[in-house]
Amino acid sequence: MSLIPRIFGDRRSSSMFDPFSIDVFDPFRELGFPSTNSGESSAFANTRIDWKETPEPHVFKVDLPGLKKEEVKVEVEEDRVLQISGERNVEKEDKNDKWHRMERSSGKFMRRFRLPENAKMDQVKASMENGVLTVTVPKEEVKKPEVKSIEISG
């Protein structure tokens, strides 16, 4: 863990300069402190997401170990915003139970991303397998310029 926030050097980290990220800038996120923009103090509240762009779709991958697909929501909004949210509830305590350690995260999470203009918002698909949520956002095909041959006279 670095003591210096990775604002400029890590292309994979959420950056305040990323035009597609709608997350609130949190200077303490990279230092390992609890998030300042969330009431939760768990790592689950700061769910990390990988977003890659391939020639055809944008692909989002989210590690959500222990969650069922019924506990996760994937939504799209009018302004090309993709929202991924969910909640893991705290295990109910029985007064006869003696807890020795409680380290698993619980709480709510929500991440929002503004998608590029070429995203086909009406064709977004999501699947969940082995605790990994995959959201696929197809892209509009780039129209290739039409090339017309000109006959040379003379």
Curated annotation (Swiss-Prot):
Keywords: Cytoplasm, Stress response. CDD domains: ACD_ScHsp26_like (cd06472). One of its GO terms (biological process) is response to heat. Transmembrane segments: none annotated. Pfam families: HSP20 (PF00011). PROSITE patterns: SHSP (PS01031). It comes from the Eukaryota. GO terms for cellular component: cytoplasm. The keyword Signal does not apply. Forms oligomeric structures. PANTHER family: HEAT-SHOCK PROTEIN 20 FAMILY MEMBER. Belongs to the small heat shock protein (HSP20) family. This is 17.8 kDa class I heat shock protein. It comes from Solanum lycopersicum (Tomato).
